[in-house]
A protein has these predicted regions:
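Extended charged/polar low-complexity repeat regions
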Residues: 1-571
Length: 571
C-alpha cells in the first residue's frame, strides 16, 4: 500500500494453515510443552460462518518499506503486529516496540464472542452474555460495572452503585433510535427523529424542546431553535461545506472556499476576515494566513502535513524537526533558542533538553501514565496512579498531595500537603452536591432538572440563583436579600450588572455597536428607593478600521490611545 505522501507499507497476511503450522512448531520448541500441539487443537481450516465461508486470512503485521523523507532509516520491526487464536479470533496487539498493548479473551463455546479485553497495565474488563448473544453484564474490577436488561422497546442499564437508566427505543431495520431516556435521578429526556432516523428534536428534563431543521437531501442541519424561540441558521454550498451561520442576535459569520474545496476566507461575527493562501492546486494546508490588519503569517509543511516552519507577522521564525514516526524532535526559535525532545521505543517523551544542555526527564509506568518528572536541577516530582490511571498521589519537594476516588471515578477525598482533608459528595448524575473544605466549612449545592445551579449553601449563607428562559443568570439572593442582577437586551447581550452596597444600588451599564463590540461602560450609584443618581462614571471604547481596540476614553479625561503593529501587538 502506498499512501499519498509516497510511503510504502507491506501488509503481511497469514492463512489459518500458516498460523497452525507456526503454533505447532512453537509448541515443539517450547520447554513448557510436554507434548506437541495437535492438529485438532489448532486446525488448518476454519468453519464457515453465517456470513459465508471463512478463508482464515488475517492481517498479522504492518511494515514500513519505503519512506521518501527517511529512505535510509527504516524501522527494523513492524509498526504493529497481531496474533490470533486457533479459531481465528484477534488475540493480542503489539506496538512497534513489540510491547503487547491489547489482549482479548473469547468464549470457547461461541467463536468470535469476546468475553474479556484489557489494555497494557490496566485491569481486565469482562463481559457476560444471554442466550441470544446480548451483553447482560460488564464487569470492571476497579470501577463501575454495568448490568443490562433487555425488554420490548426498552433497555435498562444499572451500574454497581445501583443507579438505573432506562432507554426507550422505537423503529427497526437499522433505524432503531432512543426516543426517551429515564435518568438515574428520575428525570426524563426525549428525542425525536425523522423517517431517515435523523435527530429533529430534543426535550430536556424540564420539558423544554429544542428543534433541528434538516436539509431533506443532505441531512445537514439548517437551523436550530432553542426553547426560548431563538434561532440559529446554517448555510452550505453544493459541497455541503458550511458557508454561513446567522446567530440569534442577528450577527453572521461566513466562510468561503476555492474550487477544490479549501477554506480561503473566514469572517467572524464582528466582521474581521482571515484569508488563506495555498502554494499550489494540490496543497491541502495553507502557506499563508492574512488577518484583518493585513498581517501575514507564513507556514511551511512537510509532505506528511507536519509544520516545519512558522513565520509570524514580524518576521520571527520558528522551525520544527521530526523523527520518522512523526514525533517532534526539535524546536528552533530566533536567537539560538532551541529545545530537543527524545522518545523511547514506544513513542513516549522521555526528555526535553535546551541549547544549554539543561534537561528535563520523564518516566512512565507500564500503562503509559507519567510517573516522574526530573527537572534540570535534580528535583523529582512523582505521581502514583490507581488501576485505571487516575492520579492518587503527587509528591514534589518532599510534600505529598493525595486523592481518593469512588467506583465512578469521582474524587471523594483530597488531602493536601499539610495533611488537611477536603471531602466531596455527588448526586446520581455526578454533580457535586457537598464539599467539606480544608478549613472545616461545608458547602452544599442544589440543581434544577436541567443541571443549572439553583441554590448554594456556605455555612449560614444560602444563595439562590435565578435564570431566564435562555438559561442566562438574571439575579441571585443571599439569605433572602437581593444581591447581583443581570439584564440583557433583545440580542442577548449583557446590558446591566448591578448589586446593592451599603444601601445604594451600584450598577455597570454596557453599550455595544452593531457588531457586538463593547463601546461604553457606565458606572452608576443610585438611591434604590427614589432612583436618584448619586454618582456616575463613563468609559468609552473605540476600534480602528481593522476592528482592533485602539482607544479608551475615561469620563472627563483625555482619551488614551495606543499604537499597535501586526495583528495588534502593542508597539
Amino acid at each position: 500500500v502506498t499512501d499519498g505522501a509516497g510511503r510504502e507499507f507491506r501488509l503481511v497476511l497469514t492463512t489459518q494453515a500458516q498460523r497452525a503450522e507456526e503454533a505447532r512448531t512453537s509448541s515443539l520448541s517450547s520447554s513448557d510443552s510436554s507434548r506437541p500441539l495437535s492438529a485438532s487443537a489448532f486446525p488448518d481450516t476454519l468453519p464457515g460462518t453465517e456470513y459465508g465461508p471463512d478463508r482464515g486470512i488475517r492481517l498479522s503485521a504492518v511494515w514500513l518499506m519505503h519512506d521518501p523523507a527517511y529512505p535510509e532509516s527504516l524501522p527494523a520491526a513492524p509498526l504493529v503486529r497481531y496474533t490470533y487464536t486457533e479459531a481465528g479470533e484477534l488475540l493480542a496487539v503489539y506496538d512497534r516496540s513489540n510491547t503487547q498493548v491489547r489482549a482479548f479473551t473469547y468464549d470457547a463455546q461461541h467463536p468470535g464472542r469476546m468475553v474479556a479485553h484489557r489494555y497494557a497495565g490496566r485491569p481486565e474488563m469482562r463481559y457476560r452474555y444471554d442466550d441470544t448473544g446480548r451483553v447482560v453484564e460488564q464487569l470492571n474490577p476497579a470501577g463501575l460495572s454495568y448490568r443490562y436488561l433487555y425488554e420490548q422497546d426498552r433497555i435498562t442499564v444499572t451500574d454497581s452503585l445501583n443507579r438505573r437508566e432506562v432507554l426507550h427505543t422505537e423503529g427497526g431495520a437499522g433505524l432503531k433510535r432512543v426516543v426517551k431516556k429515564e435518568l438515574a435521578d428520575g428525570s426524563v429526556t426525549r428525542s425525536g427523529y425523522d423517517a431517515a432516523g435523523r435527530l429533529t428534536a430534543q426535550t430536556d428534563a424540564a420539558g423544554r424542546r429544542t428543534e433541528y431543521g434538516l436539509n431533506v437531501v443532505s441531512g445537514d442541519i439548517t437551523d436550530i431553535t432553542t426553547p426560548d424561540g431563538r434561532e440559529t441558521k446554517f448555510y452550505y454550498n453544493d459541497g455541503n461545506q458550511l458557508t454561513a451561520v446567522v446567530y440569534p442576535d442577528g450577527l453572521e459569520s461566513r466562510r468561503e472556499y476555492d474550487e477544490p474545496g479549501r477554506l480561503v476566507s473566514e469572517t467572524s461575527r464582528s466582521g474581521e476576515t482571515v484569508r488563506y493562501r495555498y502554494d499550489d492546486a494540490h496543497s491541502e494546508l495553507p502557506a499563508t494566513t492574512t488577518d484583518a490588519t493585513g498581517s501575514t503569517r507564513q507556514m511551511t509543511w512537510s509532505r506528511y502535513g507536519q509544520l516545519l516552519a512558522f513565520t509570524d507577522c514580524s518576521g520571527y521564525q520558528t522551525r520544527y524537526e521530526y523523527d520518522r514516526f512523526g514525533q517532534m524532535t526539535a524546536v528552533h526559535r530566533e536567537e539560538g533558542i532551541s529545545l530537543y525532545r527524545h522518545y523511547d521505543n514506544r513513542g513516549r517523551l522521555t526528555s526535553v533538553k535546551d541549547a544549554q544542555g539543561r534537561e528535563t526527564r520523564y518516566e512512565y509506568n507500564a500503562a503509559g501514565d507519567l510517573t516522574a518528572v526530573i527537572t534540570p536541577d535534580g528535583n523529582r516530582s512523582e505521581t502514583q496512579y490507581d488501576a485505571w490511571g487516575k492520579a492518587v498521589s503527587t509528591t514534589q519537594g518532599g510534600l505529598t498531595r493525595s486523592m481518593e476516588y469512588d467506583a465512578a471515578g469521582r474524587v471523594i477525598s483530597l488531602t493536601n500537603e499539610n495533611g488537611s482533608h477536603s471531602d466531596f459528595s455527588y448526586d446520581a448524575l455526578d454533580r457535586l452536591v457537598q464539599q467539606g473544605g480544608f478549613d472545616g466549612r461545608t458547602q452544599r449545592y442544589h440543581y434544577d432538572l436541567t443541571g443549572k445551579l439553583t441554590q448554594s449553601e456556605d455555612e449560614g449563607l444560602i444563595t439562590l440563583w435565578h435564570y431566564d428562559a435562555s438559561d442566562r443568570i438574571t439575579h441571585r439572593t443571599v439569605n433572602g436579600d437581593p444581591a447581583e442582577q443581570w439584564q440583557y437586551d433583545e440580542h442577548g447581550w449583557l446590558t446591566t450588572l448591578s448589586h446593592t452596597s451599603e444601601g445604594h444600588r451600584v450598577s455597570v451599564h454596557y453599550g455595544y455597536d452593531d457588531k457586538g463590540r463593547l463601546t461604553g461602560e457606565r458606572q452608576t450609584v443610585e438611591n434604590p428607593e427614589t432612583g436618584e443618581l448619586l454618582w456616575h462614571h463613563e468609559t468609552g471604547h473605540a476600534y480602528n478600521e481593522q476592528g482592533l481596540a485602539n482607544r479608551v476614553t475615561p469620563d472627563s479625561l483625555p482619551p488614551v490611545e495606543w499604537l499597535t503593529y501586526g495583528s495588534g501587538y502593542l508597539a
